């Protein structure tokens, strides 16, 4: 949202370029509704937490780290589990309120 504010302070229309954010905060979601933010991404904390707990249990049990998480591991580092970001746009912002 800092980019939106900076553009407004300079008299520029933030709607003239696509500005994106991260975390799908309440302010970010409102900016999408207002048309000043093109999109944000929701980081699924619940999914991250579940995957972390499952990964810890898997390590203790000698199982593959991502087994049972429903997520994939990184191609280059088997200890990174990718919990996908969820894009939030004007089309689905209401789903995140």
Model regions: which residues?
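Hinge/beta->alpha junction and helix N-cap segments in small-molecule ligand-binding domains
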Residues: 20-27, 43-51
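Short beta-strand elements at the ligand-binding edges of bilobed clamshell
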Residues: 34-46
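Hydrophobic alpha-helical
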Residues: 1-31
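Structural detector of well-ordered beta-strand residues that form the stable sheet scaffold
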Residues: 18-20, 38, 88
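Sec-exported extracytoplasmic/periplasmic mature domains
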Residues: 4-12, 33, 37, 54-61
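Thr-Gly-centered strand-to-loop micro-motif
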Residues: 15, 43, 83
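Hinge/cleft segment of the Venus flytrap/periplasmic-binding protein
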Residues: 51-97
């Amino acid at each position: 949202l800092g980019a939106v504010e900076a553009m407004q302070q300079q008299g520029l229309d933030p709607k003239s370029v696509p500005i994106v954010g991260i975390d799908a905060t309440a302010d970010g979601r409102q900016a999408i509704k207002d048309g000043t933010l093109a999109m944000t991404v929701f980081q699924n904390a619940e999914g991250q937490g579940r995957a972390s707990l499952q990964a810890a249990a898997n390590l203790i049990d000698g199982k593959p780290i991502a087994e049972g998480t429903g997520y994939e591991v990184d191609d280059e580092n088997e200890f990174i589990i990718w919990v996908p970001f969820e894009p939030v746009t004007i089309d689905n912002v209401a789903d995140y309120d």
